[in-house]
């Protein structure tokens, strides 16, 4: 049985996550063994360190936290059915977190199943979670932008060096004739 202090601590941690985390995922972990659950936690730790947390809350505590955070309980109740685990991140890229959870889920018979969550303050369902998991991460987008910015510069360098090579060939040809 949880003490009042422990309940308050859990409620406060979830309220903090609701207010500050860029991504919160609600997952159904029913049917997962303790070993699979530990493997899942370990996988999150390997990918994100201590930044991503997977916690299981009592439904009553989640509902209380949502009310205390001045959020609409109706928006969240669909996530609180069944065995609900909560995953939240402090600074990690939300898309990377979604991809990691989806990848683990696909390799473990769709367990845990993403019910939905909150991304940058917007609530989304399982279908949107699938779409978000297909998006490129921030790092992939940065790489694409850098490549596209680098392409014209590379082309200019190649064009200029090509002209210099032609000048060198012409000078060498003149030198050989003399």
UniProtKB/Swiss-Prot annotation:
Query: According to its UniProt record, what is one Pfam family this protein matches?
Result: Ribosomal_L10
Specify whether Transferase is a keyword of the entry: no
InterPro entries hit by this protein: Ribosomal_uL10, Ribosomal_uL10-like_sf, Ribosomal_uL10_bac, Ribosomal_uL10_bac_type, Ribosomal_uL10_CS_bac
Q: Name one GO molecular function term.
A: large ribosomal subunit rRNA binding
Keywords, sorted A to Z: Ribonucleoprotein, Ribosomal protein, RNA-binding, rRNA-binding
Recorded coiled-coil stretches:
none
What is any one of the record's Gene Ontology cellular component terms? large ribosomal subunit
Kindly list the biological process annotations in GO that this record carries.
Answer: translation
HAMAP family documented for this protein: Ribosomal_uL10
Family listed: Belongs to the universal ribosomal protein uL10 family.
On subunit structure and binding partners, the annotation says: Part of the ribosomal stalk of the 50S ribosomal subunit. The N-terminus interacts with L11 and the large rRNA to form the base of the stalk. The C-terminus forms an elongated spine to which L12 dimers bind in a sequential fashion forming a multimeric L10(L12)X complex.
Its annotated function is as follows:
Forms part of the ribosomal stalk, playing a central role in the interaction of the ribosome with GTP-bound translation factors.
PANTHER family, alphabetized: 39S RIBOSOMAL PROTEIN L10, MITOCHONDRIAL
Q: Write the protein's name.
A: Large ribosomal subunit protein uL10
To which species is this protein native?
Answer: Petrotoga mobilis (strain DSM 10674 / SJ95)
């Amino acid at each position: 049985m949880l003490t009042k202090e422990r309940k308050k601590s859990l409620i406060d941690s979830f309220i903090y996550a609701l207010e500050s985390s860029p991504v919160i995922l609600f997952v159904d972990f029913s049917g997962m063994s303790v070993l699979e659950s530990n493997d899942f936690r370990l996988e999150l730790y390997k990918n994100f360190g201590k930044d991503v947390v997977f916690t299981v809350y009592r439904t009553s505590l989640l509902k209380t936290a949502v009310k205390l955070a001045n959020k609409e309980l109706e928006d969240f109740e669909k996530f609180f059915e069944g065995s609900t685990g909560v995953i939240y991140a402090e600074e990690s890229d939300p898309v990377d977190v979604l991809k990691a959870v989806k990848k683990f889920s696909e390799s473990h018979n769709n367990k845990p199943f993403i019910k939905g969550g909150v991304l940058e303050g917007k609530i989304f369902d399982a279908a949107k979670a699938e779409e978000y998991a297909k998006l490129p991460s921030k790092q992939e987008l940065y790489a694409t932008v850098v490549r596209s910015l680098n392409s014209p510069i590379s082309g200019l360098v190649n064009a200029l060096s090509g002209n210099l090579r032609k000048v060198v060939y012409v000078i060498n040809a003149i030198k050989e004739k003399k």
